[in-house]
Amino acid sequence: MVVKAVCVINGDVKGTVHFEQQDAKSPVLVTGEVNGLAKGLHGFHVHEFGDNTNGCTSAGPHFNPYGNSHGAPSDLNRHLGDLGNIEASGDGATKVEISDKLITLFGENSIVGRTIVVHADPDDLGKGGHELSKTTGNAGARLGCGVIGICKI
């Protein structure tokens, strides 16, 4: 059974991100566009809470139900919410195209109802040596966010 979800990002940057998963064992396809980012890499994560009442701050930390250290999307030991970076060309629109095998739209660890956050700085993927590398990837301020909601198929 296919599950689809969508996230409308608001804040200093704006965008729409779509999620699609064919079944519980398939990767999640993440596609969309974010507008207003400065040229360069920007951390892109699923955060624990679907609470944006205090802007992106109330979304909490990265979604990490297993208590792992922060890492790259290709790492087996990482937060479930660690989706790495999106790259802005500086022309306004940044395309999002990710296929991820760890996040899911099914079951107790579903990302539906949680928040996507776009950060100001590059995610160092847990390898930067900064005191925040193993928790946030030292990705900086939260520029925009939105709650991931289920879609009609």
From Swiss-Prot:
Zn(2+) binds at residues 62, 70, 79, 82. Disulfide bonds join 56-145. Binds 1 copper ion per subunit. Its EC number is 1.15.1.1. It catalyses: 2 superoxide + 2 H(+) = H2O2 + O2. It is an enzyme of class 1 (oxidoreductase). Cu cation binds at residues 45, 47, 62, 119. Its cofactor is Cu cation; Zn(2+). The keyword Zinc applies. GO terms for molecular function: copper ion binding; superoxide dismutase activity. It is found in: Cytoplasm. InterPro entries: SOD-like_Cu/Zn_dom_sf (IPR036423), SOD_Cu/Zn_/chaperone (IPR024134), SOD_Cu/Zn_BS (IPR018152), SOD_Cu_Zn_dom (IPR001424). PROSITE patterns: SOD_CU_ZN_1 (PS00087), SOD_CU_ZN_2 (PS00332). Its main location: cytoplasm. It comes from the Eukaryota. GO terms for cellular component: cytoplasm. Keywords: Antioxidant, Copper, Cytoplasm, Disulfide bond, Metal-binding, Oxidoreductase, Zinc. Pfam families: Sod_Cu. Belongs to the Cu-Zn superoxide dismutase family. Homodimer. This is Superoxide dismutase [Cu-Zn]. It comes from Ceratitis capitata (Mediterranean fruit fly).
